[in-house]
């Protein structure tokens, strides 16, 4: 039985998610930024529904998270997804933005960081995202570090992703996670992946090939009293991947151009991502869809394995 507080004033559960948590079924949280900021309407709605479908196909219940009317939506209905997808100007809400958006009663599209806040409050132990934020290149001067990394240290949620984007300093990102004692497990891969690229060039601290062992490892982390996330990475399918050296060359050139144009801070990431998309002639669109689907599917599989573990140990 779930220990979730279904009467929490800041949470609005869908009936399906509420029933799943109450009866101990596996649930996977999903962000809503992909709906409000990822693709144009109606492609954004179709993509969100496709992501939910692959979670269901693995035997888990999807819980897409948004913010509306002063509460987190824990499990968005088709009507919710349609409304968010068709509405222009919904702000992207990271962890720091949550209090103000909730207080004002507005809408917000959740990022990795804010989705983890909501998932942890709701008692959902798994979250899927195509890729996480990290330490930006030049962070030793700019101090530009994604809130995702900080939130990992605060939220008791397993995060399934295809690593971090190549535009980041992936070496420093891994160093930060090590310093914060956030476990990194690469599923059926030796290397830490880099979103569009199967390998970042950095080895993963741990490789595990069995979903049951991954599930046990996650639970062991929490049984040790840790309140932090566990990061599970899985690389993009080989047929959809983009060569690491090609991407690195594009990023270096684009970063120099961005510096020349005075583009920094929040504007740097979309600038670099657009540069990669242009230079690869849109191959990043296919790659992005690939990792959205594959990470959601793996999260569903691992959530089921984790539920099986809890049931075997009478903890579900």
Curated annotation (Swiss-Prot):
Mn(2+) binds at residue 144. Pfam families: Indigoidine_A (PF04227). Its cofactor is Mn(2+). GO terms for molecular function: hydrolase activity, acting on glycosyl bonds; metal ion binding; pseudouridylate synthase activity. Keywords: Glycosidase, Hydrolase, Lyase, Manganese, Metal-binding. One of its GO terms (biological process) is nucleobase catabolic process. The keyword Metal-binding applies. Homotrimer. Belongs to the pseudouridine-5'-phosphate glycosidase family. PANTHER family: CARBOHYDRATE KINASE PFKB DOMAIN-CONTAINING PROTEIN, ZGC:136858. This is Pseudouridine-5'-phosphate glycosidase. It comes from Dickeya chrysanthemi (strain Ech1591). The gene is psuG.
